[in-house]
From Swiss-Prot:
Catalyzes the reversible phosphorylation of UMP to UDP. Homohexamer. It holds the Pfam family AA_kinase. It catalyses: UMP + ATP = UDP + ADP. The gene is pyrH. Gene3D superfamilies: Acetylglutamate kinase-like. ATP binds at K18, L19, S20, G21, G61, R65, T168, Y174, D177. This is Uridylate kinase.
Length: 245
């Protein structure tokens, strides 16, 4: 297996992988499914094994949804801060899964949590990535009103990643929700402006504009498809690629 992996040369040297918090739920209705964590750790480990540097951002929707409580009257800033804490919890769980698979990992938080995580520091993050560690960026940007998608794009730009890989439940971007519309058609490739003009809802406006302004390629793919992540990194055409026209 190791020989097979080493024979496949990576197309990307450094990636930023964005996972939704919901992805960690698996078949559960809430929280974290350990089986999903272990499978994701294994797939990330395959990338590390062929020399790819992996930055990781995980959402917090499996543990906390601020939007619902905001609609019920909770202060938006308070809700966003609670959501940031949920991403830290997911980051700690993922670090544990990676380390149990003998993959070195570091959790960095945009909010200072002495004794729990390292505080986010770009130069330190890049040193650890260069040393073969998976770096998990948690607590979003550290500011309310910014999504974890925006945080993922921001961190990717800061650490000079080659691509943002957004893991979803479907194998790319479609003209409509393929779960609701059987006639929905998949896009193989899009430009940032097409995503914005068609209002495709791939990521929020801030995230897409960040990628467009800094020319950061973005690929949307299905993390539930075994081997999809590795296939992308060695040059396969999984999902939908979003880049400059």
């Amino acid at each position: 297996m190791a020989q097979q992996l080493s024979a496949r040369q990576p197309r990307y040297k450094r990636i930023l992988l964005k996972l939704s918090g919901e992805a960690l739920m698996g078949s559960e209705e809430f929280g974290i499914d350990p089986k999903v964590l272990d499978r994701m750790a294994l797939e990330i480990g395959q990338l590390v094994g062929i020399g790819v540097q992996v930055g990781l951002v995980i959402g917090g929707g499996n543990l906390f949804r601020g939007a619902a409580l905001s609609a019920a009257g909770m202060d938006r800033v308070t809700g966003d801060h609670m959501g940031m804490l949920a991403t830290v919890m997911n980051g700690l769980a993922m670090r544990d899964a990676l380390e149990r698979s003998n993959i070195p990992a570091l959790v960095m938080s945009a909010i200072s949590m002495v004794g729990v995580t390292d505080h986010y520091d770009r130069r330190k993050a890049m040193r650890h990535l260069g040393g073969g560690e998976v770096v998990i960026f948690s607590a979003g940007t550290g500011n309310p009103f910014f999504t974890t998608d925006s945080a993922a794009c921001l961190r990717a730009i800061e650490i000079d990643a080659d691509v943002v890989l957004k893991a979803t439940k479907v194998d790319g971007v479609y003209t409509a929700d393929p779960f609701k519309d059987p006639n929905a058609e998949k896009f193989e490739r899009l430009t940032y402006d097409e995503v914005l003009d068609r209002k495709l809802g791939v990521m929020d406006l801030t995230a897409i504009c960040l990628c467009r302004d800094q020319n950061m390629p973005l690929r949307v793919f299905n993390m539930n498809k075994p081997g999809a992540l590795l296939n992308i990194v060695v040059g396969g055409a999984e999902g939908t690629l979003i880049e400059e026209g």
